[in-house]
Regions:
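Formylglycine-dependent sulfatase
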Residues: 2-6, 19-392, 397-400, 415-436, ...
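Sec-dependent N-terminal signal peptides
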Residues: 6-15
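Long, internal low-complexity/basic segments
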Residues: 23-29, 36, 41, 66, ...
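Short hydrophobic beta-strand that contains or immediately precedes a catalytic carboxylate
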Residues: 408-409
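C-terminal helical cap and adjacent loop that interface with cofactors, partners, or active-site loops
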Residues: 412
């Protein structure tokens, strides 16, 4: 009897012990994102540039995985950071414009993934930049978001956390210095700098790039401080540390442009000792697998054993169900660039392995079209002045001239994307393949940039994803119309003439953009386009003036004055003023500021008005 009681007691005790252990939460990893603003892989020693001295980042790599192919999706802050925060493609949701003129809403049930972490027991902090282009209650996303935010404030030291730390010492603004500043020596010698082939070799260019290398050193020291804090707290080996740039930059032709210099970012993930079993990679190695910002959220959620919402566009690159071989086999990525500040564009890119395809939907706009903030950098102004003085070689001139409608680059042989192979007969099959991959991608996400921004803002932003699905056939038809620019003009002339007379304003709008892409080749359609200068749709009028003005069939300015004086929205004004700047600066038409009487003059519109009036403040001289 006593023996029975003893055995029963032991069984009960063991049962309680097992119950108590099973009731304890499973230990989960912490996550720290260290983000440097505006820098691509091209400025770090870890990626082969000896002037990018970053010992702290290299120590992360020694204990983690270095990604040779990580991409931001967009080459500018708010769009890239919104992509990072949501794990969704910006043109699919409607937050692809920077600066935003209106906030997009995420689909029902979709939340920023840091909010999902918080709802699953994580302490979430952000120090401090957000720059979101979508509606969000930040108090639901972050326990703390400020320049004082830190994981050290969590109520329970056993509580897992996600902390995002942004550093601005590599930001574009750090290169907005006056000419006199060049008297101050840099730590990096300008004589040691290697300039990209599209840059003129000038003292300003060399000093600017040397100064940027110095900023990277500052970033590295800040990375080291964060890692040391984790060490001091005894949690470094419980924490995945991600270091990356928020997009490329920040010399000219990088930030704001969908070249590798704008999209290809450094990414190093330190693998903690206590959670290395979650990763199918050895510490101190590299991977050639492609990842982008849409993948970061699903990766963190997967490592934290939290399910990923089906609407997210990315896929995990670490954790359960992801092998090193799976990651290594990923070799494709999508990129995009739209209106950034007051400068409009629509560029889409697709990369597969060493091949990069760029589709310029408004190829008649030069890359170097005025953006006031960009041109506060002396190097931009220096470059443009040399172009105007006709002192550049053909490669250096490209930035200020019409682009090709499509571009194809072999990045292995041409890492700076200066030799376009799209017209090379030997690459015709490759071109068709890459063109098809991009087109399929854009159709699969129902790319909302086929709608003018003013139309998208008023009709799509309550739920851009649902709107895209509901209008997928229309988007597909507009995409097909836009792609008539890829065929010989003689083959599409009649179809374009028909579209110019379409009852649908969007078809008239896109037909005119295609005509502008053809330029002089489309001159025979000038008579068909003339009535559209008085179209009932103001944006169609803008595109008619743009096309007819670009071939000098008419003086486009009276039409454009009428549009800007009657436009009711900021978006419509921005589109019209972009066309005015293009026609004045690139084509040579005269602009009279006295003819403009605006109902709205602030923000990006004000920037254009300042520039056209010659009153844009430039503090660099």
């Amino acid at each position: 009897m006593h023996l029975f009681r003893l055995i029963l007691s032991l069984v009960i005790i063991c049962w309680f012990i097992e119950l108590s252990y099973s009731a304890e939460p499973t230990k989960r990893p912490n996550f720290v994102f260290i983000v440097s603003e505006d820098n691509s892989i091209h400025y770090l020693r870890l990626y082969g540039n000896k002037l990018g001295i970053t010992p702290n980042i290299e120590r992360l790599a020694d204990n983690g995985l270095t990604f040779n192919h990580a991409f931001s999706g967009a080459p500018v802050c708010s769009v890239a950071r919104s992509t990072l925060a949501t794990a969704m493609h910006a043109p699919r949701v409607g937050f692809q414009y920077h600066r935003k003129s209106a906030l997009a809403s995420l689909p029902p049930g979709v939340k920023p993934w840091s909010q999902v972490l918080r709802e699953n027991g994580y302490y979430t902090t952000n120090n401090a930049k957000t720059d979101y282009n979508f509606n969000v209650n930040r108090k639901e996303v972050w326990d703390m978001s400020s320049n004082k935010a830190t994981w050290r404030n969590r109520p329970n030291k056993a509580m897992p956390f996600f902390h995002m730390q942004s550093f601005a010492d590599s930001h574009e603004s750090r290169l907005h210095f006056p000419l006199k500043q060049m008297e101050t020596p840099t730590k990096t010698s300008p004589d040691d700098v290697m300039l990209q082939p599209y840059f003129p070799d000038t003292p300003i260019m060399r000093y600017t790039k040397a100064r940027y290398y110095d900023r990277i050193r500052v970033i590295d020291s800040q990375v080291g401080k964060i890692v040391n804090q984790l060490k001091e707290d005894g949690i470094l080996e419980d924490t995945f540390v991600f270091y990356f740039g928020d997009h490329g930059g920040v010399m000219p032709r990088s930030k704001g442009y969908a070249y590798e210099s704008g999209l290809h970012v450094p990414l190093v993930v330190r693998i903690p000792e206590n959670f290395k079993k979650l990763i199918d990679h050895k510490r101190g190695t590299r991977t050639n697998g492609f990842v982008s910002f849409i993948d970061f959220g699903p990766t963190v959620l997967n490592l934290a054993s939290i399910s990923v919402h089906k609407e997210l566009d990315g896929q995990a690159f670490f954790g359960k169900g992801v092998s090193a071989a799976d990651l290594a086999n990923r070799d494709e990525v999508f990129g995009h660039a739209d209106r950034f500040d007051e400068k409009f564009d629509m560029v889409r890119t697709y990369r597969k392995g060493k091949w990069k395809y760029i589709r310029n939907y408004q190829s008649y706009y030069a890359d170097g079209l005025q953006n006031n903030y960009r041109y506060r950098q002396l190097a931009y102004d220096n470059w443009r002045n040399l172009y105007r003085a006709e002192r550049l070689n053909p490669v250096q001139r490209q930035f200020f001239e019409r682009r090709s409608v499509e571009q194809l680059f072999n990045l292995e042989k041409d890492p700076h994307e200066v030799t376009n192979l799209a017209a090379d007969p030997a690459q015709s099959k490759r071109l068709a393949e890459m063109r098809g991959l991009l087109k399929n991608k854009m159709k699969s996400i129902n790319d909302l940039s086929f709608y003018p921004e003013n139309r998208m803002v008023t009709t799509a932003l309550n739920d851009g994803v649902a709107f895209g699905r509901e209008h997928s056939k229309q988007i597909s038809r507009l995409s097909d119309l836009a792609d008539t620019a890829l065929r010989p003009f003689s083959e599409v002339k009649q179809a374009l003439a028909s579209s110019l007379q379409s009852k649908g304003a969007l078809r008239r709008y896109w037909a005119l953009k295609v005509c502008s892409n053809f330029g002089e080749k489309a001159k025979s359609l000038a008579i068909a386009a003339m009535p559209l200068l008085n179209d009932k749709n103001l944006m169609v009028r803008v595109r008619a003036a743009e096309f007819l003005g670009s071939i000098k069939a008419v003086d486009p300015m009276p039409t454009l004055y009428g549009v800007v004086n009657n436009a009711e929205t900021e978006q419509a004004l921005m589109i019209a003023f972009n066309t005015i700047v293009y026609l004045r600066d690139q084509v040579g038409h005269k602009y009279d500021p006295e003819k403009v009487k605006l109902k709205f003059n602030k923000g990006e519109v004000y920037r254009r008005v300042q520039y056209l009036a010659g009153t844009e403040p430039n503090t660099n001289y």
